[in-house]
Amino acid sequence: AGFSPTDSLRIAIAMTAAKGKNAFAEKTLKNAGGYSGVISAAYSLILLDCAAYPNELCSRSAVIEKLLSYEIKSGGFAFSGSRGDPDVSAMVLTALSPYKNDSDVSPCFERTLSFLSSVQNGSGGFSSFGTENCESSSQVLIALSSSGIDAARDVRFLKNGRSVCDAIMSYRRSDGGFAHISDGNSDNTATVQALLALLS
């Protein structure tokens, strides 16, 4: 069995980061126009910008238009349903960050920032599917850093004096790893995402 569209895009992003433009990424981008879903659209845009792939492979404007069409009326973006999800909204912001000042992107970009600020928990962290977790907070920090926002000082993202950086560090365990949830043990996915976020 082949890779899913989202997995193909993830692999292509990793390969581009490691070795620059490559045939696998170019093939993936050629197919990207047929992919559906907010995450595929976000990853397509990130991949396009990883190594300045040409528009001939996949139109940036078309991907941006598709991505913007997934915005939920009540705010943010989600895999499904009518309520925004911090994880997905953050991934979209990361993808759109190079275009945040474009007239067709800026209004949605600012609304999504406002949405994330409004759903930030008192701990400084973020929840997905009702559970506060390290990975959601990490995705938001990556999005804010990509957008040039100082998550430790911007008042929109300080709750009870705590930032998303504070929330992420609360998941750190004595073995150096990071847990998925507050009372959990170190988790590989949480650790990778936390380190990526803190380095962003």
Locate predicted features.
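Buried hydrophobic core positions in alpha-solenoid tandem helical repeats
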Residues: 1, 28-30, 67-68, 112, ...
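Core helices of alpha-solenoid repeat scaffolds
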Residues: 25-29, 60-64, 109, 113, ...
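Short, charged N-terminal helix-start/capping segments
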Residues: 64-65, 69-72
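Conserved helix-to-beta-strand junction in the class I
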Residues: 119
